[in-house]
Amino acid sequence: MAHASEALIGFAHPRESLEKGRVALLKAIEADERLSIGHSGLGWVQLWTGELDAACESFREALRLNPSAPFALHGEADCLMLDGHMDESITRLRELAAVSPFWAVHNLPLPVHLYMIGRLDEAIIAVQDVHERVPHFKMHWVLAWVYWQQGRFDKALEEERLQLKRHGDTVLLAALEDGLAAGGPYGAMRAMAEALVARANESYVDPFDIGATYARAGMVDEALHWLDEATRHGSYELIYLAFWPHLDPVRNDPRYQDLLQRVYGERAQEIMRISGAR
């Protein structure tokens, strides 16, 4: 998982890191196939590279070896969501939070999945529960997504401000305020997206983040351009491409359908149907 983590924070290319991770994990499994973490890690590599059936089999094997394996619980929840079993997916994530209640990485999936399947009020409650349990881990960005989807733009932008202030990101904060003054909430998103593009010329920015921000601004062409770049790049968030509510503005565009085909392969039509019913 260390190789994947390097890519998550911009120190390496996702595709290269995942292949290095795959080699290391296969060696670990060969050395001791009874260790569940090896199968969990391999499952995540397979999921992020679009090998959905193989990933879900790896997660099941990890859980057979250790029914409380946290990374495998998260992975199986993703598999259940991709198969259309939303309630079962959420149940798995509640198990995950119970197994690892104080580790931030295992408390993030529940509110995010609730957001992805449109259970927005529950997502807010889940975030609040995490804030009480893990006070140092503030999910302002998740609340910003949820409030935006609810049309509560003032609250969404306030959560964006809190997130940016927490990270000391004065550039994006200034872009938000300037864009808001010039063009309202959608202007704020546009200005933030443009600031991310400018930043990408100097340092690492996940192209998925740029595309998602343009989508929230309602700028379909720009959003799809950067989502296409994210597909070439191998951005990890693409595994949820069919489900992110903030991508709704691009959902009916044929170019988005093409991206889904590239991400999900032969399961694209099935997953499109499932995500449309959320």
Regions found by a protein language model. Name each.
Residues S5-I9, P14-E16, V23-L26, L35-L42, ...:
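Alpha-helical protein-protein interaction modules
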Residues E30, R34, R64:
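Short alpha-helical segment in the cytosolic histidine-kinase catalytic core
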